[in-house]
């Protein structure tokens, strides 16, 4: 629907005139408009669908290698409760964090929890 149209327009506008190597070198940060400035978090299913769509749009216009190389990160009420599930998603390459990292303790707690979840999702063991 409309969200897909807006995503396509934003990506095409930002990358107008760029070649595939440049499109693949960009870090794409996604946050649902309705989540900006709120404590309302998107479900992991919603985030997976949106990030998959972003990657598909990049692939359609700049090719699969650009889509695979692109880094797509998520923000939108990321916190210690939902961060592990979000970072474990296949198309989520990282997180950008707001109020959950306003303090050093909050930031380090989230980094530790998310790093452990990322390692577990990849089959590695956290130290």
Predicted features along the sequence, with ranges:
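Active-site rim beta-loop-alpha module in soluble metabolic enzymes
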Residues: 1-67
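Hydrophobic residues within beta-strands of alpha/beta enzymes
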Residues: 28, 93-95
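Conserved, mostly hydrophobic/aromatic
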Residues: 31, 86, 98
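Loop/helix-junction capping segments adjacent to catalytic residues or to phosphate/diphosphate-binding pockets
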Residues: 44, 80, 104-105
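Alpha/beta-hydrolase fold nucleophile elbow
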Residues: 69-72
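Glycine-rich beta-to-alpha transition loops that act as phosphate-gripper elements at the mouths
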Residues: 74-80, 99-101
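Catalytic cores of alpha/beta
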Residues: 78-91
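C-terminal helical cap(s) of enzyme catalytic domains, especially alpha/beta-barrels
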Residues: 89, 101-127
């Amino acid at each position: 629907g409309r969200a897909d149209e807006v995503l396509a327009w934003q990506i095409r506008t930002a990358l107008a005139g760029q070649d595939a190597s440049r499109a693949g070198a960009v870090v794409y940060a996604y946050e649902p408009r309705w989540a900006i400035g709120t404590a309302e978090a998107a479900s992991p299913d919603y985030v997976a669908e949106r990030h998959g769509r972003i990657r598909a749009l990049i692939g359609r216009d700049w090719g699969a290698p650009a889509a695979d190389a692109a880094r797509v990160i998520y923000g939108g009420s990321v916190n210690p409760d939902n961060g592990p599930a979000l970072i474990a998603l296949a198309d989520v390459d990282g997180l950008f964090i707001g109020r959950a990292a306003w303090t050093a303790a909050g930031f380090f707690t989230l980094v530790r929890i998310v790093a452990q979840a990322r390692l577990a999702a990849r089959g590695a063991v956290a130290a």
